[in-house]
Amino acid sequence: MKGSDIPHVEANYVDLGRAVGTVCDNAHRELANVLETLPSTPADVAKKQALLEVLVRARQEFVRTYVLTKWAKVSEDVTKCIDVVAWLHGQRNCFDNLNHMLVGLGRDLGAAKSRNPDLQTAVQVLTRGAPTTFGDHDMAPKKKLKPQTILRTLRDLNVLLSVQLAQSTDIPPQFKRYKIANGRATFTVANAFEVDVGIADDTLDGPFFFIDFRLLFGDRKELPPQTRGMLERAGNSALAQRGLSALYSLLMKFALNYKLALIYKQIMEMSKGLWSGTLRHRFYQERSLIALEYWVSQHATHRPKSTLEIGIFSESDLRIAVRWSRQGEEVPYSEHQIQFGGESTDVASLLEYVTTLHLKHIISCVYTKLRALLGDSSDMVSLCSDGHKLRFRLTSLRSTVFTVDRLTGKTVLENATSLILSAERSLNELVSRPDQAASVLFKLRLLSLENDIRTRACATGWTAQNVTLSTDEMKTHFGFTTRYVLFLRQPQWPSNWFVVVTVPEDGSLPLWWIAKLRVRKDTAWTAECMDRIHVNQDLDSLYDYELLTQMVTFASHRIVLHPILDELRAAKTPFRLLRSAQHTPVVAIDNSALVTSWSHSSLLILPEMSAGSMDMKLHVQGRAKTVMNLPSNDSIDFDASTGIYKLTLEGANTPGFSLVNKLKERLQQIEQIVSYIELIKDLGLELVTASMQQIKFKLGDAQVSVDIPSELNPNITLHLSPTDPHNIIHSYLQETLNSSGLRPVVWLLQTTRNLYTTLQKLQKTRGGDPEQLEKIISNLSISDLETRQKQLQPRLSIVPRSAAFVRLVYPGKMNIDVTLVRHSATLDGVKFFIKESPLELPPPPQPGQPPVAVPRKLQVWNGSVTPDVDVGKAVYLNDGIACEGDNVGKVLEWVDKQIGK
């Protein structure tokens, strides 16, 4: 006959993968810890000893793990061996128990005596040494029941039970599920128990009595006889007093407490296994409550605890429920929805589910708090897909992963560095709430960012300085949100200039400043100048050699530009600091106070420093509103296609250099040239050449040039061609140019050209041409000059009194005045008045002398003499003639002809 199989042991088994992972995590953690502490160990021998101890322990653990993996290949044999050992221990316990039972039986048989009146049995014992039959003294003989009687009785009992249960009003809802068979009613409560009850008589209101009881959970073994007897007595008493409701309450409490005992047994076994040192538990039997505290290594005396209370919490609702307190705060059922104590009583699964929820809660709270702290820079923190880890960017190249060990509750930060390990210790030693964890991680971000910038800057030639600013200075310049300040400088800079890096409270991006400081008497520093440097950066920016080199270039230029910026502020000239593509500062000036209308209101000033020195020149760039084609030179450059002009100012770093004065001088010079060019274009004249020194244009057939004031020639000068008839009034034109500008000069040249051309012609005709007279005189001797003195006197002299008033002197005859009058801006408003000016009367003749003839007066003024040529529109005024500019020459020629008659 084949025996039954050996029972299989399933308790205290751990997955091989989980065990291997735990060994690897512990080895990594110990190795990281010893590597972190090695720099603080002074002796090399001690360092080697500490490292060797860690390696030996790790090797022992990995050897054990290797043995386990070898066993895993023959897992069936090993499992069978474990089952055999467990079965042998069980058999030994059985024999031990049998021995104890036999001893107890021998002790109890002393009271097992036959009654004295049973003489028959006594005689048998006396004669034969033992009774030959069971005694039936005073006993009525039993009648055997027929099977038909038994079946009929059972059917009757079934009918009576059906009727009685149908009429019963005190059946609890949990007993609505029942079946009737074999003369008994069986009530089943799912995942709890089954109970059989029967009736003692055939009355419809007779009481029920307890028959049998079975548990529907655990190993479903028979209850011990003592427990069963106690339960039967209590059940019959409850049925007799209060019916089925009392029976349900009694049996349900018993089943639930029995289940709690089995649950507590699991907890005790778990405390000896993988969860050792992480659980604290207690069973309150009088309250039907198990208090299970997890992550006890994280719970100091002053910190709130995380507990699971498993038990019966209501007499009206008899069931096992779970109440979860997470770090001292009860978690509502709607959040966790834990179903435990019914179908599932696996405490390991319950703990795994709860710790997973707790882990997700911590991760979610830390994530929310970090996003609130980071503000717009929330891309630095992200959740992993499973929600069990949080990735946090510390710098552009470094990040860490925040999570919690579900077994111990300790915080773990991956990608370890010295700062990250320090933060991990702080999280495990000091932190009790997720908001504190977020603050520690946020501080780690700030420290990592500051340390990254400091390390890279020092590696690229910068020096970090310990500068102490007062609290008021910090608040004034950096605000209340600045957490860390780093002072950097270059060795070649002046000692009081620094680049300041501030890390704001939100930890998003560092702010860069250029600062000029001075030391106060109390050794604290104060800022004379603190300007923001706008760096094109984002979360992916690298604070590498390229960026820091660009910062050196920008800051060096900015330091040299500082006196110029102070001058602009003092002159109340609006400006903005920009940054060029070559990473140098660019000053954008509002030049509305420097120029009027010819240029746009913005000027860009680009500094250029010589390599290896502090010498600097300034390139000023602007744009004219109208495109000009002006020639360029060493100090100014014009782009005829775009209208952009560029100025170069030398010696910007020399003492006494004034940017405002230099700009005013250069821009006014350009403005004057531009105004002249626009004037010439407006007047419809032809521009011949234009430069920064001179502008030349055509006026009729003649060319007129104007010298522009400059540093070498501070005066504006008008130049006429040698044959220009206006040379006679050049001094008056120059005076008008100095006082009123070029427009009235051009107007005079245009308006009076007919007049002075005619005057030049008349002068040549009457022998008043200076060149012709000079030629004649040069060919005569002194005696001829005396003889021809009267003959050589000019018959016409032109005497200009101003640019608009000229007198024609006819010696011995008369004077003619020509006056230009402008009544309005229209062409009709310009008139020439030609009139006869009275001569001075000769003195009265001396006695004996003939009387002097009185000069005659022309008769042309009153219109009595008709012109023999077309003089155009002329108005006779009795004492003169008014005519237009186009006809003034013809009128003068006609008047001259009348004078010559």
UniProtKB/Swiss-Prot annotation:
Belongs to the Mediator complex subunit 14 family. It comes from the Eukaryota. Component of the Mediator complex. Transmembrane segments: none annotated. One of its GO terms (cellular component) is mediator complex. Keywords: Activator, Nucleus, Transcription, Transcription regulation. It is found in: Nucleus. Component of the Mediator complex, a coactivator involved in the regulated transcription of nearly all RNA polymerase II-dependent genes. Mediator functions as a bridge to convey information from gene-specific regulatory proteins to the basal RNA polymerase II transcription machinery. Mediator is recruited to promoters by direct interactions with regulatory proteins and serves as a scaffold for the assembly of a functional preinitiation complex with RNA polymerase II and the general transcription factors. This is Mediator of RNA polymerase II transcription subunit 14. It holds the Pfam family Med14. One of its GO terms (molecular function) is transcription coregulator activity. Signal peptide: none annotated. Disulfide bonds: none annotated. GO terms for biological process: regulation of transcription by RNA polymerase II.
